[in-house]
């Protein structure tokens, strides 16, 4: 993310060479900060403990702003899931964005609003994001404001399957559902 890098080392061989990787990335990309955010099932399978620390620079005081496909996202690179944002989903966000114009959109398991914010950037009729993480939905809501679309936005915290059942029970329907 510009002058901040996030490394997610999920394999033992990467962990063993992490200092070399940080040095090489620093030499080539000249970042101000490098965050190591290694946590999750993959590390457990490799016999590794969680590892979250700053390899270079300072921890950002708050979530960082990330512009992508005309939308604005906020990523918590220090405490967020994986690297703070699913940046590898850019092409998929763009694909959904192209489909979303004028449609009501339900983004399930939305994290920080990946598909929903992309839909907003292309004038979706409405966007509802559902996730189990209150901090992630807070970042999605910030992104909705920063994207400055006229699209009505709603963030719902809860178990995705329970929420979808509740929405169906209320008679709510959507023209585009991403989960």
Label each region the model flagged.
Residues 2, 30-32, 102-103:
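Short coil/turn connectors at secondary-structure junctions
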């Amino acid at each position: 993310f510009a002058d901040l890098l996030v490394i997610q080392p999920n394999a033992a061989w990467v962990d063993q060479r992490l200092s070399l990787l940080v040095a090489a990335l620093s030499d080539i990309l000249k970042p101000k900060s490098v965050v190591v955010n290694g946590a999750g099932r993959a590390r457990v399978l490799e016999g590794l403990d969680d590892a979250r620390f700053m390899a270079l620079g300072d921890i950002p005081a708050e979530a960082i702003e990330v512009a992508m496909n005309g939308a604005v996202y906020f990523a918590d690179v220090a405490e967020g899931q994986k690297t703070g944002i699913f940046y590898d989903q850019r092409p998929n966000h763009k694909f959904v964005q192209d489909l979303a114009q004028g449609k009501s959109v339900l983004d399930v398991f939305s994290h920080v609003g990946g598909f929903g914010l992309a839909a907003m950037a292309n004038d979706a009729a409405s966007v509802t994001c559902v996730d189990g993480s209150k901090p992630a939905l807070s970042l999605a809501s910030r992104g909705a404001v920063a994207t400055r679309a006229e699209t009505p936005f709603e963030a719902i915290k809860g178990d995705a399957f329970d929420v979808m059942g509740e929405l169906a029970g209320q008679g709510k329907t959507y023209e585009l559902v991403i989960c």
